[in-house]
């Protein structure tokens, strides 16, 4: 099976997203969704730093390298994907909190939206989670 850029390891090689236009890192959190809605991904680290489209990088090497906008933005590759990764040094040890937020319905998206969030550590899938979000809802994964 071929990789489909959907936050699921479709080809079962324990590595997500080969050829999807965004990169892996020592740690990586990716969200994908199934409507034209704009869904935002937030990751808060043990030092209290929150990464999102509003704060796309930290001095520790974390960065948002793809922030999809669903149907809210016209000409964007992979508009239903958000990807946060840590490059360079290992991320700080501790607990990381991941949240998904159904920001808006955009032009054609709307209603309940299924969101898949995957977490990879050392380029290996550590967990995949599926949520159903309603407009305006923000949920801890």
Language model features: what each stretch is:
Residues 1-24:
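Extracellular calcium-associated, cysteine-rich motifs in secreted modular proteins
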Residues 16-141:
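Intrinsic-disorder/low-complexity signal
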């Amino acid at each position: 099976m071929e990789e489909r850029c959907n936050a699921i390891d479709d080809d079962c090689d324990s590595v997500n997203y080969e050829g999807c236009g965004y990169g892996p890192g020592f740690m990586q959190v990716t969200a994908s969704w199934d409507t034209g809605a704009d869904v935002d991904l937030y990751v808060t680290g043990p030092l209290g730093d929150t990464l999102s489209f509003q704060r796309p990088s930290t001095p520790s090497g974390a960065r948002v390298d793809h922030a999809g906008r669903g149907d809210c933005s016209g000409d964007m590759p992979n508009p239903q994907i958000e990807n946060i990764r840590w490059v360079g040094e290992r991320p700080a040890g501790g607990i990381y909190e991941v949240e998904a937020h159904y920001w808006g319905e955009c032009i054609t998206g709307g209603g309940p939206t299924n969101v898949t969030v995957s977490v990879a550590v050392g380029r290996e899938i550590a967990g995949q989670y599926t949520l159903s979000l309603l407009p305006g809802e923000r949920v801890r994964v």
